[in-house]
Amino acid sequence: MKKFIAQMAMAALLATPVLSIAQESQPSLPYREVSAQAEDSHKVVVFFSFACPVCASYDQTFSRWAKTLPPGWSAEFLPVAVPDKGNYIAARAFFAVQDADPSRLAAFMSAAYTLIQQNGMTMEDPGTWSRAVAMADVQGFNEAWHNVTQQRLERAFAKLLTYGVDATPSMVISGKYVITPDDVSGDSALYMNLANGMISKVMQER
């Protein structure tokens, strides 16, 4: 599984005491429990990277699964906005599409994965994103791109640190439980069953 937190990210984590730092749960459990974040209590936050081949393999699965969540729940896809050029450009492009033409976001993500994972394009290359936008027929991208603020990217990075995410993909269930495919030895069907089970667990706890 792709590990992506660089030394800079870990240094930021250690130097930021105001953030809720993930606390390890029992090693035998297929999830990690962290300090609960109330704003995400009815969400599944999906952390991903376009550079991650495992994320690419889950792209369509996540998209379909997000539509099956219980009433009152939502899925939030969040790119790993680690402060390096490639990840920042990728995150900015994602947010721009999300703002400009949200109905085309899933198509944009699939196009970006294809260009990066299959065609060998890079996240640092602006041409990757202009091509993905064209493939997905996104409208209004350029204006939205200029309106994505540095603060928004920093908030995405802060959430990454809050949940102690160190692998992609990772799902955070109800702002409390973090799960990755590694927790189920990479079994994709079991991973999605685990996600459903964690949502059921949360609903029973309320």
Predicted segments with their positions:
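Extracytoplasmic/secreted proteins, especially bacterial periplasmic and envelope-associated proteins
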Residues: V46, S57, T61-R64, Y88-R92, ...
